[in-house]
A protein has these predicted regions:
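Alpha-amylase-like alpha-glycosidases and glucanotransferases acting on alpha-linked glucans and related
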Residues: 1-22, 30-149, 206-207
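Metal-dependent catalytic neighborhoods of phosphoester/phosphodiester hydrolases
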Residues: 26
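Loop/helix patches that line or flank the sugar-binding groove of alpha-linked glycan CAZymes
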Residues: 41-43, 63, 71, 98-101, ...
């Protein structure tokens, strides 16, 4: 259905959890995903499969083109931007060793087979801009956009949209709701996302909330 409408592929949530009680290495899950990949190659060869799996040697063996590094499990990804003492923080107290060890092993196990994705964030964690200014974010993006693999930008991160702490939980989002506010396209009612002055998840009410239109006009902006 979605592919016939023009979608370019699927980002599969919890891709490693489809088969319950699978054996170590998830062989049953891998076989099932291989069947789906074979269907795509036959019917929609232009489409891509991206997995929320976190073990690229398994997910790519299962037919996915790309796999995300995740914010749960080993602390490799969280040690970069989040966690108690992230590497990309002004204080300079972080340690990148765990990330490098994990990423190097992932890269070696998938060389020539598929891509590892380091996301700027997602809907389940505080935004990258939390606790950082635009200079900090430029350094983060210089890293993300030059590492091997395929970088993924969570919507709004490209303009430094802020994490909105303390807003009401929506749809069981709890603290995660603060990373799910509407995209801020331009400085007018509804930020160009809607013509309404209110939205299901609140807007950033800050006077200096970043917008796409303003950043595109500024040669020194994060955009």
């Amino acid at each position: 259905f979605w592919l016939d409408l023009g979608a370019d592929g699927f980002r599969v949530d919890k891709a490693l959890k489809l088969v319950k009680d699978d054996d170590e290495g998830r062989p049953a899950n891998i076989r099932l995903r291989q069947d789906f990949r074979a269907f795509l190659e036959r019917e929609y060869p232009h489409c891509a499969m991206v997995s929320e799996w976190g073990v690229p040697k398994e997910s790519i063996a299962g037919g996915f083109h790309m796999d995300f590094m995740l914010h749960f499990g080993p602390p490799a990804y969280t040690s970069l931007f989040r966690g108690e003492r992230p590497f990309f923080a002004k204080e300079g107290e972080g340690d990148i060793t765990a990330f490098l060890d994990t990423f190097s092993a992932m890269l070696a196990s998938t060389d020539g087979k598929g891509l590892i994705c380091i996301p700027s964030g997602n809907h389940d964690m505080p935004r990258l801009a939390r606790g950082r200014d635009m200079r900090d974010l430029k350094i983060c993006f210089a890293f993300l956009l030059t590492m091997p693999g395929a970088p993924f930008l969570y919507y709004g991160d490209e303009i430094g949209m802020r994490y909105l702490a303390g807003i009401p939980s929506v749809e069981g989002g709890y603290f995660r709701t603060g990373s799910r506010s509407p995209m801020q396209w331009e400085r007018r009612t509804g930020f160009g996302f809607t013509s309404s002055a209110t939205s299901y998840i609140p807007f950033d009410k800050s006077a200096d909330a970043p917008t796409v239109s303003e950043q595109r006009a500024d040669a020194d902006s994060l955009w």
